[in-house]
Amino acid sequence: MERRIFGLENEYGVTCTFRGQRRLSPDEVARYLFRRVVSWGRSSNVFLRNGARLYLDVGSHPEYATPECDNLLDLVAHDKAGERILEGLQIDAEQRLREEGIAGDIYLFKNNTDSAGNSYGCHENYLVARHGEFGKLADVLIPFLVTRQIICGAGKVLQTPRGALYCVSQRAEHIWEGVSSATTRSRPIINTRDEPHADAERFRRLHVIVGDSNMSETTTLLKLASTDLVLRMIEANVPMRDFTLENPIRAIREISHDMTGRRKVRLANGREASALEIQREYLERVQSFVDRTGTDATGKRVLELWQRTLEAVESGNLDLVAREIDWVAKYKLLERYRAKHGLSLSSPRVAQLDLTYHDIHRDRGLFYLLQQRGQMERVVSDLRIFEAKSVPPQTTRARLRGEFIKKAQEKRRDFTVDWVHLKLNDQAQRTVLCKDPFKAVDERVEKLIAGM
């Protein structure tokens, strides 16, 4: 697929600390967070002017789904815009708590596990052609996705009966099968529920739910772009060595528990291979594929970072990517803190730091502290992120949705939208179906807008 549509969904962890007598349940905290949204959207499930969807998911987790993007830098900017929008709701909610005499602070974490062991996700979406063999795509992709954590995990201190352990991935402990149509009860690597949000005869949406939520822009870019490159290679029928894993679920945990990337996992054919070996093979195949087909500046940057991350893991010299890869940046931060204060990995203060890395409040979160000190690399500017809060991508269907919502709100018209429908509720027959996610211009939508 020459042009691909991408989307990213992040669920956020919510917690609240109280200094007074009055305590709120997570549900009540979520209601405070979404009060402003409900006041204008009449619902806690809304689409925004930038084409994105914002809603309260199961278990009081706010979720932000980016608009459709056909450019990965746009996608990184829109993912970060989601953080900024939620940070605004958080500041608003704290203000409202104070006005009501409740002494408390609300925290939003862009991570994947809470202290009670619950997991919430980061879901990646890649549009693929319907005519390909989805089973074959999944077969080649799963070994890549299981081992990809060593280049784009978010890192986590895992408390076990045998003591604390620093893991590469947050989600690895919570994945229970390879391919499935459920997303919550049995968390698979690839979700097969067939909801393309597009013309179902032409397209399918590959829904990857194994990944960690990333704070680092560069890690997010590497996660998405490496997967896109592997997909392109599969779509071009490039032959691959068979890395089918005997037990992907055991493998994903074993790899997460090994920062060296060297632990061997069993393959279905009886051989063994390490995460480093499997990733190197995918990288080499992608590199020679790109040498033949060409790539842009972003692609070159991603291939260089992918290569350097594998070198850092293999050599043990993690400083090579400490400014770019989440799990490494966090590990280095925790190690410095432990050395300074003489703490063990199982110390509650280390657990607190582990969590605070993911705090999206820019004056509190440790990731943002590192970024403000110039210790984390960027791929998009603050201006681009700010614009993405209100302006949809201009080259996809999201533009149509965003323009429609903006105009309907300005004209105070009652409307309903989802990923494919735009509807004015006060005119019985005024619904436009937008089945092509690549289409940013549509006369029918322009007419609908002009008629307001």
Curated annotation (Swiss-Prot):
Recorded GO MF terms: ATP binding; ligase activity, forming carbon-nitrogen bonds; magnesium ion binding; ubiquitin-like protein transferase activity
Listed GO biological process terms: modification-dependent protein catabolic process; proteasomal protein catabolic process; protein pupylation
S-S bonds: none
Alphabetical UniProt keywords: ATP-binding, Ligase, Magnesium, Metal-binding, Nucleotide-binding, Ubl conjugation pathway
NCBIfam families: pupylate_PafA
General remark: The reaction mechanism probably proceeds via the activation of Pup by phosphorylation of its C-terminal glutamate, which is then subject to nucleophilic attack by the substrate lysine, resulting in an isopeptide bond and the release of phosphate as a good leaving group.
Function: Catalyzes the covalent attachment of the prokaryotic ubiquitin-like protein modifier Pup to the proteasomal substrate proteins, thereby targeting them for proteasomal degradation. This tagging system is termed pupylation. The ligation reaction involves the side-chain carboxylate of the C-terminal glutamate of Pup and the side-chain amino group of a substrate lysine.
Name this protein carries in UniProt: Pup--protein ligase
Organism: Thermobifida fusca (strain YX)
